[in-house]
């Protein structure tokens, strides 16, 4: 049955989030200060009656992706989402600078030659959508385009 211990409020389903072959459970860690379109999760695995931490993530249900964030960086960043431009911005809490941005576009609305996206790199293409990213190379939090390609997962 449902109890306080078994009820989860996370909209993200269980999955192998880190590629280790085991199914992890997402626990909702979203705060009221966070954009409503973005949720954050603490991923745990179950072993012999104990839940143990695996990793953290931000999820964007509207755009269909999960972004796995390194444990060391998770407490240092916050996520903002602009629903009009479909842009997720990860911000360094300490110096309030952008760490990186991810923009979601419908495939037919994207052109490599569009000057609006000249600073962005495609990190994923899925189900008619294109996901573009721009990293702040001068950020104290070291994340590059290749790292972002590894961090992003499809719902």
Where are these regions (language model features)?
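N-terminal "mature-domain start" segment
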Residues: 55-77
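Short, flexible beta-strand-to-coil junctions
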Residues: 28-35, 93-95, 134-139
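Surface-exposed amphipathic alpha-helical segments
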Residues: 73, 133-155
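Repeat-based blade/solenoid architectures
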Residues: 3-13
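Structural motif
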Residues: 32-47
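Secretory pathway targeting signatures of secreted, lumenal, and periplasmic proteins
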Residues: 70-122
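Beta-propeller fold detector
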Residues: 1-2, 52-58
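Acidic/hydrophobic-patterned starts of short beta strands in beta-sheet-rich repeat architectures
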Residues: 17-29
């Amino acid at each position: 049955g449902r109890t306080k211990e078994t009820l989860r409020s996370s909209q993200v389903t269980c999955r192998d989030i880190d590629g280790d072959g085991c199914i992890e459970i997402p626990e909702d860690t979203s705060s009221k200060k966070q954009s409503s379109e973005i949720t954050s999760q603490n991923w745990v695995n179950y072993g012999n009656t104990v839940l143990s931490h695996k990793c953290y993530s931000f999820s964007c249900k509207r755009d269909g992706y999960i972004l796995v964030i390194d444990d060391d960086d998770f407490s240092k960043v916050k996520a903002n989402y602009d629903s009009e431009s479909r842009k997720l911005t990860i911000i360094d809490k300490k110096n309030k600078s952008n760490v990186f941005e991810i923009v979601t576009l419908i495939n037919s609305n994207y052109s490599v030659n569009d000057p609006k996206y000249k600073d962005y790199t495609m990190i994923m293409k899925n189900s008619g959508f294109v996901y573009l990213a721009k990293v702040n190379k001068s950020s104290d939090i070291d994340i590059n385009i290749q790292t972002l390609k590894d961090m992003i997962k499809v719902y």
